[in-house]
Amino acid sequence: MKKSFQKSLIAASVGAVMFAAVGTASANSLLFPFFTTNSGAQSVLSLSNTGTAPATQALHYVYNYGAACTHFDANGSLTANDVLSHSIASPAAGGFGKVVGSDTSVPVYFPLPNQTGFLIVSSKTVASVDALRGSMAIVDPTTGLVVSYAGIDNAKATSGINGANGEGDYSAIVDLNFPLTVLPAGIVSTTFFAVVVGDMGAVIGAGADWKGAGTFSNNGNIWNNDEAPFSGTVIKPVVCQATLVPTDFATGAQAAAVGPNGGLVKTTFTPTSLAPNLPTGVIMTKIQTVLPAVGAPFAGKQFLHREQAGL
């Protein structure tokens, strides 16, 4: 990558995340449901500490990455009223490090390139439900993705030992039903990134991989883009996180009947509880890529948003 373009990429992602960080989600555990360390991409995390005592607050980063949702964690720190912005990827893995190199706060970088996953960052020093704020921006020139979003707030005081006092507890998320739509395949390619959540505290405390699991069902029907239903049941198992495509929710016959013009599927996720992995819901993210047939300047752009639950 040319240095000038790389600097522009970094500036764009940093500017987006620093702007978005002001007044965004606040809690002592923040969940960021999607990051990437793909070659040439930058995922940039921005955190701020609104606590005033003590001056330096311990942070616990828990990365969950790859098909196996592998656990990687370490401790960082954040001084009072500071803004810490840094690349998710370590400099050795293609990241640029801290936005301000002289910042005395200590981030935890992810050491591997070409990975995707989700991240939980928790405050460990101050027993407060609003000391930690944060957001993430992602710029990926290969896929065309440019997005900034706030971390998801669990509103629990998470001080103390790792995994205790509500750290990683997202059992309040009980989203199970999602009406998923797909635009015509000739103009947009659609994928979904599902993250299974629940109370992850015990798993975090043990330093183990989160194995929250369950199955998606299409509830026996899918619809084409003109409301015609086609029956057939598909069950899709998911453990921790998964990238899903529209055909994961359809039989071969249903997919052929719906055709290339897009459609609707009303999915339901059924959690499977096996202690200490106790899932309660799903965070579903939709990723749409505009295809070359659309033409410039839109072709090659990628859009990401969190899907709203409810049927």
Model-identified regions with their sequence ranges:
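Positively charged n-region of N-terminal signal peptides that target proteins for export
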Residues: 1-7
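Gly/Pro-rich, tryptophan- and cysteine-flecked surface segments typical
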Residues: 4, 14, 23-311
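Hydrophobic helical h-region of N-terminal Sec-dependent signal peptides
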Residues: 10-18
